[in-house]
């Protein structure tokens, strides 16, 4: 229902076919927005639907600059973005998982311990019941909605010490 309401405003109200809807933003939305776009085009013959997977921050910026119709973000809008007139509609909820190499016996980490790992207070897995090995952190790049969500949940905004910062959730 939310998706139908979101796209309803993009269709022509005079029954004529044609036009386009462009979306830009969150890479974690790729599968969902692809399916919604296909359905939208099937129900609106002659209308094209495009998706540019640039990341949440870029999608928000694209809407502000008028380069797309719908910005996709896996984070909430910031106060300054709302002040510029942007409105948000929740389309879905995204999950974030912490993954440890299966050869490392670590399990059941609490949120406080995860935060300590990510800000560098804990640097060896043996300190949390794992192997005697360096903690290597891989995550999303700055501007990513997934990263923003993770750092908001863990209280580690702008403090994480990533070894690698990747440009898509799939790459992580």
How would you label these PLM feature ranges?
Residues 5-9:
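C-terminal motif of bacterial Sec signal peptides marking the signal peptidase cleavage site
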Residues 10-172:
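Exported/periplasmic ABC-transporter solute-binding proteins
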